[in-house]
Amino acid sequence: LIKSSFGYWQIYTSDRNLTANKRDYMDICIINTGGTISCIGEPLAPMSAAEFATASQTILNPIVAETFPDTTLFYETALTFPESSTGTLDSTNLQPSDWCLMAQYILDNYATYDGFVILHGTDSMDFTSSALPFLLNVFDAQGFGTAVLSKPVIVTGSQVPMFYKAPTPPSGPKPALTLNFNTDAYQNFCGSVAAARLGIPEVGVYFDSKLYRGDRVLKINASEFRAFDSPNYPALAEYGIEMTQYGDLMLPGPVGADVSLDNATALAAAKTQLTAITAAIDSNPVMQLPAFPAPYSVPNATAVIADLITACAGQGIKGLVLESYGEGNFPSGNPDHPAGDPTATPPIPAGAIYTALEAANTAGTIIVDSTQVIAGTVNNSAYASGAWLPNVGALSASDMTPMASLTKTMILLSAATANGWTADQVKTLIQLNLFGEIMNVSRLDSRTNATLLPGQSIMALDGSAKLINDPSSGPIMTASDGTFLWAPFGSAAAGKPGRLVMQNDGNLVLYNASHTALWATNMGDADGGSSVLMITGSTGATNLTLSVYNYSAKSVSATLYPQS
């Protein structure tokens, strides 16, 4: 959303056209789901959405109108949670079906408003903000959006309630509500409205003057106003005296008007998918399991953690997010031989935890290897204590939070049948960057991470091949055993150093330090062609490919490996 002297313009860019719809006002929907921000009294008790709306219209709206006279706030009260007598819900008690209710309300009212602000409790805010991107968007089996969010959805809450209600005197009129003293609720509310006015086409969390990507946040503090942070991805905007935006960090939104949720067909597709997810989500439970020091016996092949895994699998858990130590290390139950050694004399049994995870994987449970450390990236091959995990089917969460890993896995499983995805396709999607929740491991995207600098690399999701931009020789793709697979000039020896750029015209170009093109696919489109360089498949399955996919035209524009 761009502000000009004429008002607000909502812009959709595609490769072949540009349309603009002039707006001289903004309508923002405030959805109160509950939480501290809308509690009053001693002890704190939730207000109904209607009570909070009345108080906000009286106390907050005049202040907002002074700063944003062209913005109208609408307090919607129709969304209620059936498990609560007040209709609002402490986020401690939210369940996955409640995420679907929020998403359904947004989609049902999408055409009415220019943006949405969700007031939410802080206890599980990072789960909700991680779930909503996967509920509000539709994508194909390759992870490319087919119905994409085009408006802001900002989630916020507070550590201190918004309003104060004095004790009721024995006689006389009841005291009116007032703004609470030293509350972060007021700042977070106003900041969220300001953030929604930016028109960022993604789900965000606004807290303590910063706007974060919703599927990147973690709750880091229970008692201070800086309750949330995004350790693995920078803030999208900061509110000081003025709002400072970091546009290069924001999601680009729909690639064209045809896949925007402003398009009636795309919106209908999103609603259809959400209906299917809502029907299936309770049947696809996913749980988190942290690594912790617990008893195990190598000779007896027993372990407390193994018993927990077996019990959970027996209850129908469809996904298991391991919150491992460090870079993705998880106890196996046999430190020296996680998988055992049946050829030894006497035979060495596999670790009990290894065996339990192997059985869960065989039974169809998706296992994701995350980390309980708040920042950094999973690299389970760095230590022997984590290198065994791929053998039991564990997928790397890379730099995803455990919350994003859980919600993403659960929602993809719930959407699989309706979208016709196989189990292997779901596993691939879990590891792909769909809505900014994870770093791009296997792709260069012209709209988000377009450049491969010297020393940087992308790789196959299973690690069987890597394309590295060698500082001396330029781009070289090799198998994990070092076998040469591809280079722009036919061999590593003929290579030249530079920057490999996936351009937004669909052309993949190698530039030298003087920005002279050394090599190119020469498949560019002058009218634009948002594209991605991607490694798919595996050397082990003999289906490895390196190709340029034009996701504007929905077609492969160049196949670099294998070469015909």
What is the predicted function of each stretch?
Residues F6:
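Beta-rich carbohydrate-recognition modules and glycan-binding surfaces
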Residues N21-R23, T146, A279, I468, ...:
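Generic structural signal for beta-strand residues in well-ordered domains
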Residues Y25-N440:
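Active-site histidine-anchored catalytic micro-motif
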Residues N440-S564:
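Beta-rich ligand-binding surfaces for carbohydrates and other polyanions
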